[in-house]
Amino acid sequence: MTPKLIIHGGASSLDDKGGLATVRQSLHQIVAAVYETLTAGGSAMDAVVQGCELLENEPRFNAGTGSVLQSDGQVRMSASLMDGDRQNFSGVINVSRIKNPIQMAQFLQGQTDRILSDYGAADLAREMQLPIYDPATDFRIQEWMEERGEDVRKKMARLIADPTVGIEARKGTIGVVALDANGKIAAGTSTGGKGLERIGRVSDSAMPAGNYATRFAGVSCTGVGEDIINECLAAKVVIRVKDGQNLAQAMAKSITEALENNTDLGAIALDHQGHIAWGKTCPVLLAAYHTGTAIGDTLELTDGDHYGNASILKLQKTVKKIQTKTRGK
């Protein structure tokens, strides 16, 4: 079977990440590196962990290095991993002072207690002898200081001028869904949270609402965590595929429902037949994928492109090229 892969770097603006070309280069490089693992015989789980690590190590994304700071100025990260073949979920919630939370989720796959938070996650990090690491970047520290230093009047003026200001960090997450040569699926999601949140807040990234996989399909979500939890988006899409809908139908129905509820979210997905799909209610979805023959992405979708798949996007690009050539004549 031809392996398939899709990754995302969140649902936030391209502008604060270096622009279209920079983000595209970063995502495409990671997709290419992870796909090599799959073509070399690596498992879906191997690919997902590798992809999450690479995305966590990229400071422009809100996971691992470059995670946003909470209200007290500390970084607390969450991550989960799901083996679709075994339908086995594991994760850590609000873990600090490590580099790659996905590694802890991977370790927990083989444990009886597979979801740990706060003090339990800290104990596990020591048990695993993970090096102490500060994931906060100068950019995130400065961002936190500016947000904390603003008085209410200034903050309101900024929000009126640009309604997206102040909410972009809430939509930062990274995720990977992979299908290997044996037809097995895995999904992983990691986040630094929404920024300035109350201490103890739990995101969707370490829940089946935000990350879920079975032998039928796998989904990773991004966006406002509370919206994703309310929709139970990842599990909803996967269950619909299991119940007989194809992946495109399952994603379209789930995103249509999310639009009706005025949510702010996005999702990437794969199924056991190798179909690749995505959906979003947010303006931007920073996703890239490998079809087995080519790398593509969703970076230039419009606000009205709420759901789609690799085949449709390829067709749209072909039509666009033909139209451009026709105009040139």
Swiss-Prot record:
Signal peptide: none annotated. Transmembrane segments: none annotated. Pfam families: Asparaginase_2 (PF01112). It is an enzyme of class 3 (hydrolase). Its EC number is 3.4.19.5. InterPro entries: Ntn_hydrolases_N, Peptidase_T2. The keyword Hydrolase applies. GO terms for biological process: proteolysis. The record marks 172-173 as: Cleavage. CDD domains: Asparaginase_2_like_3. The keyword Hydrolase applies. Heterotetramer of two alpha and two beta chains arranged as a dimer of alpha/beta heterodimers. Degrades proteins damaged by L-isoaspartyl residue formation (also known as beta-Asp residues). Probably performs the final step in the degradation of the reserve polymer cyanophycin (depolymerizes the building block L-beta-Asp-Arg). Also has L-asparaginase activity. Belongs to the Ntn-hydrolase family. This is Isoaspartyl peptidase/L-asparaginase. It comes from Synechocystis sp. (strain ATCC 27184 / PCC 6803 / Kazusa).
